[in-house]
From Swiss-Prot:
Protein name (Swiss-Prot/TrEMBL): Mastoparan-V1
Annotated keywords: Amidation, Antibiotic, Antimicrobial, Fungicide, Immunity, Innate immunity, Membrane, Secreted, Target cell membrane, Target membrane
Tissue-specific expression: Expressed by the venom gland.
Places the protein is found: Secreted; Target cell membrane
Keyword check for Secreted: yes
Top-level taxon in the UniProt lineage: Eukaryota
Gene Ontology BP annotations: defense response to bacterium; defense response to fungus; innate immune response; killing of cells of another organism
Tagged with keyword Secreted: yes
Main location: secreted
Site (May enhance the stabilization of the helical conformation but leads to a lower membrane selectivity compared to its homologs that do not have a C-terminal Asn): 15
Role this protein plays: Antimicrobial peptide with high activity on Gram-positive (S.mutans, and S.aureus), and Gram-negative bacteria (S.enterica), as well as on fungi (C.albicans, C.glabrata, and C.neoformans). Shows a potent hemolysis on human erythrocytes. Together with phospholipase A1, stimulates prostaglandin E2 release from murine peritoneal cells and macrophages.
Length: 15
């Protein structure tokens, strides 16, 4: 599981 990718997606979803 790519945590960096997940974090990026979460950040994008928060925006």
């Amino acid at each position: 599981i790519n945590w960096k990718k997940i974090k990026s997606i979460i950040k994008a979803a928060m925006n």
